[in-house]
Amino acid sequence: DLRANDLKRSQEIVESKSQRLDAGILDLEKRKFLVDQKEEYLIKLLEDVSGLTKYQAKELLIKQIKNKSEKELISILKNAELQAHSKAKIISNNILILAMERIKVELTSQRTTNIVKLPSDDLKGRIIGKDGRNMKTFEQIGGVDIVVDETPNVVVVSSFNPIRREIATRTLEQLIIDGRIQPVKIENELKKQEQELEYIIQETGLNTIKELNINDIDIELVKLIGKLKFRTSYGQNVLAHSIEVAKLSGAIASELGLDVEKAIRAGLLHDIGKAIDFEKQGSHVVLGAEIARKYNEDPIIINSIESHHEDKEKSSEIAAIVAIADSISASRPGARYNAIDEFILRMHEIEKIGNSIPGVAKTYALQSGRQIRLIVDPLVASDLDLALILEKMKEQIKNKVIIPGEITITVIREKKETDILK
């Protein structure tokens, strides 16, 4: 009986709890219903106020969040880009500083005169010669001016063409040592010194490629490199500039982990066209690319030559490095002087005009272009042609070249007969 009473009591407790649970569930359902109604009412109210449905409001909210996120992302990216640019600038500056510290820069400016020292002022009369014949021989055969003034124990060899000036200077120095100064001796010595200078040009080229550790290069290209020693541009010696660009290019390439040997070679050859641009028509860029192709240089070298003045698009990192190195070398203080180069361009133009006239073998622009000598080929032009050649030269000079003051043009036709009596 006691067990039956306990069981009955337990059943009553369970039923009581079950009833309370059912009542609670019912109450929750009523509350949920009221909340749902309230939610629908509020949504309807918001839709009426905003003019948006629930789904439209949801889309608008998502869009606003997306726009905000995009703005934040753009801001982050801009900051990262600025930091990257700043870091890249610091790195690039460090590379250039390291590259420039690793090379020795020499300031080499242009001259249009050489000074020849004399052991005695008495030699000046012998240099001038009877009726100025010796000086005229230097002008007509050598294409230079010999300036004799009151300055003690010196004479000046003047010419815008550095190769002619060097040949004439060496000739005069040798004649002073020899003691015999006369037209025939001057002419022979000029020819001899021209041959010797060709050897010096080749040796200069060989020493240059040795200094830069450049191999497998055609000997004719080596000679052109040596010829740059006697070429100037904007007052800057072209060989010195090319060596500087080569060293800078190699140093920058080394810092960037690129082909150092190719960068040095491209830097050295970037202005190779200037070895012949006073002899052939065309820009030094076009002529340089032609030279590089002729001697089977690498396409990267050719493109570096073609693109260093932005004439063509750069196809490699090496080409970009050469252009940068060229700008550094050309822009440093004291590297270039425009006025002298403009003068030289005028002198070249005068000689090109003269040489373009039929019958003219050689043209020399002397005394800053105020004296022009036209040497006529006696086998092509007769004495009767001299006046016509003179008129053609005068007309073209008037139209193409501006030279202040008076210009004296002299046309020379000379025929020599030489024989050996045995």
Swiss-Prot record:
PROSITE patterns: HD. This is Ribonuclease Y. Residues 112-172 form the KH domain. The gene is rny. SUPFAM superfamilies: Eukaryotic type KH-domain (KH-domain type I), HD-domain/PDEase-like. Belongs to the RNase Y family. PANTHER family: BIS(5'-NUCLEOSYL)-TETRAPHOSPHATASE, SYMMETRICAL (PTHR35795:SF1), SLR1885 PROTEIN (PTHR35795). Its EC number is 3.1.-.-. Endoribonuclease that initiates mRNA decay. Keywords: Endonuclease, Hydrolase, Nuclease, RNA-binding. GO terms for molecular function: endonuclease activity; RNA binding. GO terms for cellular component: membrane. GO terms for biological process: mRNA catabolic process. It is an enzyme of class 3 (hydrolase). Residues 238-331 form the HD domain. HAMAP family: RNase_Y.
